[in-house]
């Protein structure tokens, strides 16, 4: 019933928008609408092919011209069309040429040529790039073609062929306008693919509009894409367990339009819940983070929606073997725009091979198991973004997101009682940007975020009910002021107030047991940083001051980011940062929350320390034409980590000890691009060790200590319709703790326990996987486009072990049973998407 009302609401909303909103261009006039007015005015009839004229825009309103002959002369002189009188009433309109050639020049606002801009036929995958003079030429075009101009750091331009002809020289001049960030901060415009860029501060940025294809994926999963970067790993194939430079997953902070997300995933971590159709770009920051960002001692991930109001309504619908979705962007008027999207799992109708593979991967070794007939799992997400442009200097944005995952598991005894687990996220945020004058900019943002995890578990012949709950509530207010001394030097300062509450509850009805833990932290932060950037240098130095009231602690966190570029080809950089975070995840017991999502959020207090990190890195990037080599060396120390948050499943899994982690590594990326092929090879060499003095005097390998990891990939662009991608990954096995073979169990007081050997002294076999995707453009007609994508994860269907642990043998207490966590099996997926 809830699903019915939810879908009914969104269907009604879409009908209202489609039926009530009409958007008109204020800078040009539709040729088709104008000639209809001319027909009425002069009592004539035009003959034409609709596809030839429907995209043409005119700079003048020809229906206001006084005579018919002047109108026909204007058409003949200012378009690619020929208007010919057949008789006194009928007029024929036809293209002058079957194939059209255009040329032009691209400039920035200062009149400087833009080199290497992409000039592409919209909806197709071929085009050209602009020369050093900003010049471009395209041939064999039709009058219905639309041409798109793209250059990283600048807003894209979309023009019909008819708008790109000058009656005087046949070469037009176009000016491209910069996006929000400064172009001088962009160092590599095409990093691996044309959808990725690397900024001078080391940030890797994914532009979703340019995203084409990634091996194994049929949808642009933003968090999955991050794993093609060196130093970004997921030891268990889950995006909820992404490790950046060996930091565990809760050490990554994810912001969606300034809103902190505590769980941005579906299927308990297998796929991203952030809809890519409304998200413009994703930024991944490994080191040298700006002082304005808090938390995330290992990385900061920024997901941003578009801040630019669109002139026309756009949207799309799509479906794959996991879910179906839709999105729409509606300009209500020239100042207000509403964007919304939804996605829903489709297993209510049928269980696809993809769903079964994901289900088996997610629920293996849990109370649910792999029997889909006794379970009912579903998920959905909703995104809403409202943009209000008060004037040219002031923009207000309101965002809302809801993420829901529900699982009901029915016991096989025929009873109506069901084990349940619900994982939800709700958040609303507001951001106000103001350009006070040419030198001063201000931003004020705030959000309310809620994360909840709830499970009901029946045991002992349905007589015992265990309820477990974990909840995080967070309110935040942030204000920043940026002062530009000149084009090169700026100073940014600000204040942030965070209030975070964490609840953990366990309730058992028989025997009666109730444990409730509540913690509230108020965090005051002040930050300031100076930034200098020119053609050669990028320098940013700042400091963040934090006060945590619950533990009465203050931290001072310096952040430094320096980069120097020689001749636009060679770059050297050095980065340093200190960071802290007061929330983290722990595992109390492996059967918590049905054994599905065993991690729960906790907060720093008198027993749980504040997590602190220090990281230093140096690197160099060399680029020459279409070749790229990127190198980085890093060293990171983290203190205050909990052993119960490291994912141990051995003799220390239930202990609450705090310790430290050190990680050192080398990251290498090689990339070669051509018009038809994109090739990349990444390699990471790293070592990550833990120290908990209460159990060991020396460091021992961390659970995510993957010493060697390498990825190789190819993207092939066969023609404007067909693209494929294939990649392979191979990495060394992760550590695990074996048992004492001579005596598998021992007595610990009144209990028999597994007799483990040395912690993480053994390693699993090497892991490897091959993924493949193919993308075919089914339809590109007028303003509608349709794509069919097919992808396979684990093409070779390799059955691999991701983790090994031991439990007591239920039939023989002197024996231990080995439990293996297996990788995702051969997983095909198919998607169909239509956009307009």
Language-model-detected regions and their locations in the chain:
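Short, acidic, small-residue-rich periplasmic hinge/interaction motif at the N-terminus
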Residues: 35-45, 79, 88-122, 148-156, ...
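Periplasmic N-terminal accessory/gating domains of Gram-negative outer-membrane beta-barrel systems
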Residues: 76, 129, 135, 153-155, ...
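Predominantly transmembrane beta-strands of Gram-negative outer membrane beta-barrel pores used
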Residues: 253, 281-290, 298-306, 313-365, ...
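Transmembrane beta-barrel wall of Gram-negative outer-membrane proteins
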Residues: 322-346, 363-406, 423-442, 485-491, ...
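C-terminal beta-signal and adjacent terminal beta-strands/loops
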Residues: 349, 353, 721, 730-747, ...
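Flexible loop and strand-edge segments within Gram-negative outer membrane beta-barrel domains
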Residues: 393-442, 450-474, 514-517
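Outer-membrane beta-barrel signature, preferentially recognizing the C-terminal barrel domain
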Residues: 421-427, 431-435, 470, 519-521, ...
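Gram-negative outer-membrane beta-barrel transporters
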Residues: 635-637, 656-741
